[in-house]
């Protein structure tokens, strides 16, 4: 590989990663503002105009603090897991069309599913490496919850693949030009939305960091820079799941819109969907753990399996009919 090719690759990678990190930083500000207005208070409004520089101030503060490591923790894993979490959270964005993917993979949806499954390891190892009972319980809960809800996510993805006919995400744009998939498969979209809430450990499914019982969950022993990396990874995953939801069910490709507006439309829809995540957080109390698991294994799984069979069998059964 020539130095020029290597430099081009680095510039492409940075131009892909930096906007995501900036969006993640300002999503934290949006969250604090929305929650504060829902609770009849102002939220951050001191640092910069209307508190717009608050995420930058928070980031600088966290990264210049001294990173404290518990004496009984595993030194290598304790430092490596936050880096792994952020690395995976940024790698998953590669096949997403925004409007063009960084790598147009044939099996883009499978890549997304595989990479999101790997994030479980960063949670589990961080809880184990901390050598704290609260962190370990939080990590085990996170792993059980994430692995469980990935089952329904995979089946729903399979159903959408049946409708689009391809594993590449850009095909979904062509599929949804006449009508959004949310209209034809709204039960799948509703279950997908709730499963993404659980997959990203957001309220009311934030069992992993229940403050009243686990202090802060798997990241209880982390401070300063490593904590900031976990924080960035969590919010990057939230934005990724929302972008994927929009791509699957509310694709921003319009027949009459110029392609230059694709990114603006996508960003607006992702922001609105992220705001609904925050609305849910402000409105609902935390689920009990057994209710969380019953919701998936006793309600969502039978429904998604039935709908997957429906989406598989209907085109085949109608294919034999004569045209109207």
From Swiss-Prot:
Q: How does it sit in the membrane?
A: Multi-pass membrane protein
Q: Which domain of life is it from?
A: Eukaryota
Which molecular function terms from Gene Ontology are attached?
Answer: NADH dehydrogenase (ubiquinone) activity
Main EC class of this protein? Answer: translocase
EC number assigned by the record: 7.1.1.2
Q: Name one GO cellular component term.
A: mitochondrial inner membrane
Question: Where does the record say this protein resides?
Answer: Mitochondrion inner membrane
Q: Which UniProt keywords apply?
A: Electron transport, Membrane, Mitochondrion, Mitochondrion inner membrane, NAD, Respiratory chain, Translocase, Transmembrane, Transmembrane helix, Transport, Ubiquinone
Q: Name one GO biological process term.
A: aerobic respiration
Please provide an example of a Pfam family that matches this protein in its UniProt record: NADHdh
Please give the start and end residues of each transmembrane region.
Answer: 10-30, 76-96, 107-127, 143-163, 178-198, 229-249, 260-280, 300-320
InterPro entries membership: NADH_UbQ_OxRdtase_su1/FPO (IPR001694), NADH_UbQ_OxRdtase_su1_CS (IPR018086)
Tell me if Metal-binding is a UniProt keyword of this record. Answer: no
Catalyses: a ubiquinone + NADH + 5 H(+)(in) = a ubiquinol + NAD(+) + 4 H(+)(out)
User: Function of this protein?
Assistant: Core subunit of the mitochondrial membrane respiratory chain NADH dehydrogenase (Complex I) that is believed to belong to the minimal assembly required for catalysis. Complex I functions in the transfer of electrons from NADH to the respiratory chain. The immediate electron acceptor for the enzyme is believed to be ubiquinone.
Q: To which protein family does this belong?
A: Belongs to the complex I subunit 1 family.
In its UniProt entry, what is this protein called? NADH-ubiquinone oxidoreductase chain 1
**What organism, scientifically named, is this protein from?**
Excalfactoria chinensis (Blue-breasted quail)
